[in-house]
């Protein structure tokens, strides 16, 4: 059933793609001789998504990374921890991927996945056999373009509890766990976005509601504030076609005016 849904959505994305122009090559780095450099090609899609491809055919695997150029430094006083909290919500399912299905699709394909957040970026990544690349790109496109309607209060409360437990385990209840928090608080002036930890303060996590997180997504998430990086046993032309196929139908986020 899941494969049928995947194929149906793939067909819909492909039809939408026909109305859009192609990705533009903006940078190409090639290795010369014994030069210590990683060759890659960089493209920009019409909606602003950056796509970086590195070919490495040494093993039949591929690494897929979607980086959004937003982290805890874009939070406000009283709203700390939003970027990291939303990282958790991105694994809770989207319009076409039920809760738990994202993990299942990746692991059933023989892959691994995770995400991370720091002050200036949030990224989501998978490593899978290279013949599973299209599924991974589809998953990333679906949660970029079709996530918010799938955010429920139940999922929100579940992840609020998870994030609070994570803070307790890694900071509050660990010997010297608060050293980094006190260091940041004293290193930067009050109100500076680097003065609080990415995990956020417990009082802010208690205060946040689902609409706050949705507004954070609407403000900072979108193709024109993201970079898709693909590295492994792939052909650059094939990757670009897949990126166009699944991402071209996702509109530019007009709230984003950053220059990357």
Regions found by a protein language model. Give the residues of each.
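Basic side chains
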Residues: 2-4, 42, 160, 167
